[in-house]
Amino acid sequence: MLLSSPTTPSRGRTPSAVERLEADKAKYVKTHQVIVRRQEPALRGGPGPLTPHPCNELGASASPRTPGPARRGSGRRQPRPDSLIFYRQKRDCKASVNKENAKGQGLVRRLFLGATRDAAPSSPAPTERPGAPAGWAGSPDTPEATGKRAVCPTCSLPLSEKERFFNYCGLERALVEVLGAERFSPQSWGAEHGPQVATSPPPGSGDTSDWTSSDRDAGSPDCAGGGGGSEAAGSARDGRPTVSVVERNARVIQWLYGCQRARAPPRESEV
């Protein structure tokens, strides 16, 4: 009995795809060396049984079976990980990340605590603050007094860059020195510090009646008298409303902006 080779197609079966590609290689390969060369399969499958089983009740044909396709992996299929394994992996990953973050936060906390401990002995002992002025005094139960107590500690702190920027109306230090730094101090614009403040209006402001009337009121003896100063000042202004802080600051900023524009070189019109 002649046994046919598994690589050569038999007459009773159809050729496989590999055999058909091998037969038609000359159609899609241009190099002669590649046409002549024959590529061996990476994994060669074992030959199947050539004769039917004697106990086969279905009466299979006597033709030999075709060899099964070559399998690149092992016969046993790897189990697919289920959702529980994915959940455990994510949980372990999150736990490790949380541990690393906790270590980093603990290190930063120790560094800051160490810095504060080192700075605590070197810093001088806190001195007792003087008593609050009468303007801040009030009953502790009122919400207004609570808000004032929250704002009051910031008054004793040194000026930051932002506060210095707003006090100097955003001007450069050189321009402030030219105009005079004493003009930007809060004491120079407060009406409660005495009759020497606000003696002349800013040059950039157009209406000078409010400024002159306030100067006359500040220099009047009724204002210096004490108790009825505010009522006398209001009556001396002939019923005119007082200049608000916002309007006064707007006039000061307008005047400073005019000074800055006058100092800058004139620009040529591009129109």
From Swiss-Prot:
UniProt biased composition (Polar residues): 1-13
Pfam families noted in UniProt: FAM110_C (PF14160), FAM110_N (PF14161)
Stretches for region Disordered: 1-84, 118-149, 186-242
Superkingdom of the organism of origin: Eukaryota
Family: Belongs to the FAM110 family.
Protein name according to UniProt: Protein FAM110D
Naturally occurring in which organism (per UniProt): Mus musculus (Mouse)
